[in-house]
Amino acid sequence: MNFKIKTFFSIKSNKIFYTDFYFFLKKKLIILIKNIFPEYFNFNNKYKNWNLICLYDLLYFKVNNINFLDNVQYINSLIKIFLPLKFQNLKTNKVFFKNLLIFELPKYNSYNYCYLNGLKKIFISKYFTSNGIFFNKYLKRKYNIYYAKLLLTNSNFFNIILDLKLKQIYLSIKNLKFNFILFLYYLGIKNTDILKYSRYKNSKILKLLIFSALQTDLVNNKKIILKNLNYLKSIFKLTILNKNYKNFIISKDKLNYNYGDFSKNNLLIIDFIFILDLLLDLQSKKLCFKTIDHLDNKHINTIGNYFQHNFKFYLKKFISIIPNLIKLQKFSLLKVYNFKELLILNPLIQYLEQINSFSELMHKYKLNNYNSFSKGILNLREICLNQLGKLCLIDTTEGINCGLVVSFAKHIRIYKKGIIQVYFSSIFKNKTKEFLNFKTSLDQELYLIQFNNINLRKIKYLMNVRLVYNKNNFRIKFFSNKKSILLEFTDLFSFTENLIPFIKYNDPARCLMGAKMQSQSVPLLNKKKSFVITGYEKEIITKSDTTIKALQEGIVLNASSLKIHIKDLFNREIVYYLSKYKKSNQNTIIHQKPLVWNGERVFTNQLLTQHQDIIDSEFAIGNNLLFYYGNFCGYDFEDAVIVSKRVLYQQLFSSLHMDIYEFNFCYNNENDIEFSTLEIPKQSYYIKKNLDSLGIIKEGEKILTGSILLTKIKVAKPTYTYKSIFKLIYSIFGKTIRNIKDNSLYIQTGKSGRVSKIELFLVNISSRHKYKTYNNSYLKCRIFICKQRFLTVGDKLCGRYGNKGILSYIAENADLPFLQNSFYPDIIVGALGIPSRMNLGQLFEALVGKISFSYNIRILPSFTTSSNLYFNYLKILIYNFLMFNNFKKGFNWLYNFNLPGKFIIRDGRTGVKLKSSVLCGVSRYSKLIHLIKDKLHFRTTGPYTEILQQPLKGKKNLGGQRFGEMEIWALEAFGASYNLKEILNYKSDDCFARNNLKEYLLFRNTELQNSTITESFRVILKEFNGLILNLELFLITDDLEENYLNLTINY
């Protein structure tokens, strides 16, 4: 009987994170407070003795919403934890009860995120090594040394190392070593007990180890024995001579499964003898061991475990400040200890990526394996065979954290205690039978994992030969009806990689880049479904939390653009509110539309809404473009992209973004106050035409660069040194002179758009309702500006295969080369990026997309087309299909017998047939969020770093433009040599040319010289010199003898 991975609704179970968080608050928090908080406190205050008693069992919670002034997008829900305290006067026996506010925590919902300052934050999972016993080896003096690592529940560990070359076995704790036989002697185990319970009692090796320990004088010296006992007590923090180690709580099911003969309860003294036998088994190669990095030995950390671990640290600090928190005279609270730094500064709690619904889903799928010790360990970064079906083999971060931050596979579930589960369904004679649940990966080792779509031969007799994986090894076996797991090709990856149609024909590094680019794509206004699909476009929407799904079956009573009203089977009315023009964390717009109508019957988990990147319940974030691989006037240099104006006119890559402006009106006293008015000095009526009577921009107005958003004037009395001058001015003009300061808010360059909403909040400053504000503000204004970004030169376009480039030129349609059927291409891409990056998949997508474009159909290619039949079957299938349809009427341009898959094109300007042929097809392209308007800013002179002499980063620091590799290629394609020279030399780290240009512009007393060598190139020369390599440059002179002169480098 075989088993196949089962697809089910909930993949990564957010319910485990949600329930574990509240289980910690209800159950574990009380136990934690009892262990750390003392039950009684004594206070002395002005001749009064007070006794404070903590009532742990009366601990309660209260959920409140933060004031609306702090809610930018959503309502912030807080959980307040109160600890009741009992105050008793020891003299008068007077009793008071007060509730002490310990912590304020954000409320986590069932989708595993919370709200902080109105913005979504998510907890990134992290997996740790479970407590237990792990065996490993290392090479020392060309000899394998085996050791056992015991990891305890209190994060302490020690090693038992067997070194037969030195004829001893010793215990290593915190870089200190002493004999393991002597350690057993301290525990009360005699040598006769070791020989009695050990399986090697008749071997010479064990007797030799015992004899080497007895040779030392440590056994007979009582002072050394007492010293070692005290040292062991300080480390383990328990009575060493106990026969049962209650602190050594280790999961025995894994140990008994792997090695057997362990006791059922906690670690006993006899188990140390069994560990000694296992080390001798490994030395004699009678037993194989699992490494500590095996996925069996890991568990996922949930949000409840995270708070439980950090509460211990903060509770201990909280005890020390309790006397300062409570005034015994008034019995009131002074302040609450700040616990929010745990939520703001911790790298595991991040702002949710909301570029599109796909990026939000994949952000929840991240898994962190980073700690302070894993940065230089290469074993943690490698792909282990036990990760098949559980962790994605490709998806990871780039840079120094490569391999440390990975992603879950598509069909996994987090079970209790952080165990990863994969669900399977049994298959017998190609029919699905009963449902089977593998609780742990230990059970998976009882079955053979088959890659059923990988055939090794074309001969029919050998078609049943399968590649099988079992117990960390690959084998080749004949197919049988024994228990086996049929692992599909798509089950090895996450959803990001499964959106790439022909992933098998690409380089894995480019597939990773293509997956990252899809999660960074911006939702478009005029988007279309892709012609070539994988079948996972609809499945992503069912897994995503960005859409609204029906909680109960029922009938729609009312469906509008604001809410959906449904009556369920129990005659209950459920209202779903839609998100309308809300800003995401990455400044994109979240806008939901209803999918149901009045009177429709809906079922559980049915989609009720769609948003900005969904078409007909399917993920669609790009457009299908007709393109060809070639060149056009050199504008396609390297990865630069050329686009026709038809794409710009039809707004195929136009997107919406939103900015939020917040500002306060402050006051110091009655005479020094900020206010808004239409009568601002030195401004014309043309500038103030979009303002209302209060001096605030009107809703729906179009604002450009330099427009006024809000007028803000501060009036204060001027200060005079001589009062006589003040009286003279008052007698002449009849009015007092006021000092008016204009603090109006103007739109910066690149921030133009349309005002969508304005919010005004009046802060109540009365004595009854005090609200603590910054800078004594009495009024808060919030303006929402919606921006429409068109496709401009400098934006990034990308495909699904990691093929991305900077838009370098927007050409006229009539100037571009056209095909035989008078079709003009939408985009032109350089052809050199395919063979150098081994992206054969995008060639297949171009040909298949051309077929689907011609017949107006959508094609779902199988991942296992060539594997089930023979190699090159997919290429032959596509060519035969093109040739077959070539004979139909109107499709004779699809296939050229002389040039299969290619087309002959003509110049659009002259109509002359070009010599070379090009590969033309239809592929899906999308626009990345790295827009040129956000990156480009003006910078004449600015600060530089002292050591590297590079411009500082960021607009706030007046830093340089972030010109990368592809931006330089776009400038080179356009032939902008002077701009390129200015960016790479004068605005970069060429110190000599920079100083020469400054003196030339300021003083005009020096000539403008050529640019010299940059500082970064000088660093490379120094590194070459460190490798005993010398780099010299030569110039050819104009002499008739053609002598070479050495060019000196100033470094």
Curated annotation (Swiss-Prot):
GO CC terms in record: apicoplast; DNA-directed RNA polymerase complex; mitochondrion
Keyword GTP-binding attributed: no
Main location: plastid
Keywords: Apicoplast, DNA-directed RNA polymerase, Nucleotidyltransferase, Plastid, Transcription, Transferase
Keyword NAD (UniProt): no
Transmembrane parts of this sequence: none
Sample GO molecular function, one term: ribonucleoside binding
The reaction(s) this protein catalyses: RNA(n) + a ribonucleoside 5'-triphosphate = RNA(n+1) + diphosphate
Matches recorded under Gene3D superfamilies: 2.40.50.100, 2.40.50.150, 3.90.1100.10, DNA-directed RNA polymerase, subunit 2, domain 6 (2.40.270.10), RNA polymerase alpha subunit dimerisation domain (3.90.1800.10)
One Gene Ontology term from the biological process aspect of the record: DNA-templated transcription
Subunit text: In plastids the minimal PEP RNA polymerase catalytic core is composed of four subunits: alpha, beta, beta', and beta''. When a (nuclear-encoded) sigma factor is associated with the core the holoenzyme is formed, which can initiate transcription (Potential).
Function: DNA-dependent RNA polymerase catalyzes the transcription of DNA into RNA using the four ribonucleoside triphosphates as substrates.
Official protein name in the record: DNA-directed RNA polymerase subunit beta
